[in-house]
A protein has these predicted regions:
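Charge-rich, low-complexity linker and terminal segments
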Residues: 1-15, 75, 79, 86-163
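The −1 position to Zn-ligating cysteines in a subset of zinc-ribbon hairpins
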Residues: 66-69, 128
């Protein structure tokens, strides 16, 4: 999503409203792929006398990932407020600042950053998810006709323990 800031540059100190949606690519976080729906972004922007743009607003989206306990599908509502300054003709490779050139300002980096910062540490399918149910293989009843792929290894282990 890009903002046309030409009016703000012509009228420093005056706020201009904006709203729209911003797509965010899937994110890999600690080895887990998190899918993020399109973000609804709304707020205001204002230029200062040096051409820097202050952008403030709110983003709302939904993120999806496997449950940390049981690996079923889980999702979380993401809401985050932001206030950032975009530096005119700043270094676009600098990860510490937001920058823009000309009269158009892209909020993609801002939206992605603030969305990732608001993600939960762990996704849960429900608050009281018990996780996987552990079944002790030694006490589990053996059902006739079912083949257990590692049964042969268990026999080898038992034979090596006898020696």
């Amino acid at each position: 999503m890009e903002l046309d800031v030409s009016n703000a540059l012509s009228h420093p100190g005056q706020e201009f409203p904006f709203s729209g949606t911003q797509a965010i690519a899937d994110q890999e976080i600690y080895g887990t792929i998190v899918q993020i729906d399109d973000c609804l972004v709304e707020g205001t922007f204002m230029a200062d006398d040096e051409g820097n743009i202050n952008v403030k607003g709110r983003l709302v989206t939904r993120a999806h990932a496997p449950c940390a306990n049981c690996l079923k599908d889980a999702s979380a509502e993401i809401e985050n407020d932001f206030t950032e300054d975009f530096i005119r003709n700043g270094d676009p490779e600098d990860d510490e600042i937001f920058s823009y050139e000309g009269h158009r300002l892209s909020v993609e980096k801002l939206v992605m950053s603030y969305t990732v910062m608001a993600l939960p540490i762990r996704f849960l399918c429900r608050e009281d998810c018990p996780g996987f149910e552990y079944k002790d293989p030694d006490t589990a009843p053996v059902e006739p006709g079912i083949q257990y792929p590692f049964a042969g290894l268990k026999q080898l282990l038992e034979q090596s323990e006898e020696v």
